[in-house]
């Protein structure tokens, strides 16, 4: 579950004259946040900083809170997609939509998209690739890589390239889902 608070006035000690301050908090299912949550916060904040048009809200702050309810794998990609949709729902101006996928490199070298938690544990490496997806003037999709995070040992450059390529194609599917979800939400608002 992801919530967006703001934009609101930033504290004087943290405000930036030329742009928005973006805070990300990741809360685990139970207990206190640990190093994994702190790393996720940094990765999400870095990716969202590329996505949000920060110059539109100088001296303001936005807080994105990710509450993990369950972890069945691909948590970083799921949190990023949730954060992007929450920002859209809050009306925050974005450069594009964040889309991508987690891929697991299995021991035999095969690449598995959207692995579950057990598949991630048994994988040689887990790679999360996320793209800023936006429409070009001709109607085609532009996918710009903004985050590639690997855990484990990716033994060959070809394996990493295969993970990024598969995630690039999955980004098109995620973008289509975004469009469908937003059209459904818009139609529900129009009917009211």
Task: Spell out what each predicted region is.
Residues 1-192:
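Polyanion-binding surfaces on beta-sheet-dominated domains and ring/shell assemblies
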């Amino acid at each position: 579950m992801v919530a967006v608070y703001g934009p609101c006035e930033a504290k004087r000690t943290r405000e930036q004259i030329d742009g928005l301050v973006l805070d990300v908090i990741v809360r685990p299912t139970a207990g206190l946040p640990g190093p994994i949550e702190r790393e996720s916060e940094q990765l999400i904040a870095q990716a969202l900083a590329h996505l949000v048009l920060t110059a539109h809200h100088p001296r303001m702050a936005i807080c994105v809170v990710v509450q993990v309810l369950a972890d069945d794998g691909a948590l970083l990609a799921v949190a990023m997609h949730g954060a992007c949709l929450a920002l859209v729902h809050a009306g925050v101006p974005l450069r594009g939509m964040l889309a991508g996928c987690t891929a697991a490199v299995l021991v035999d070298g095969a690449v598995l998209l959207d692995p579950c938690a057990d598949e991630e544990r048994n994988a040689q490496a887990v790679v999360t690739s996320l793209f800023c997806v936006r429409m070009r003037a001709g109607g085609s999709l532009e996918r710009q890589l903004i985050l590639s995070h690997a855990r484990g040992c990716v033994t060959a450059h070809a394996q990493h390239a295969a993970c990024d390529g598969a995630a690039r194609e999955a980004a098109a599917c995620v973008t289509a889902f975004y469009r469908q979800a937003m059209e459904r939400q818009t139609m529900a608002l129009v009917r009211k």
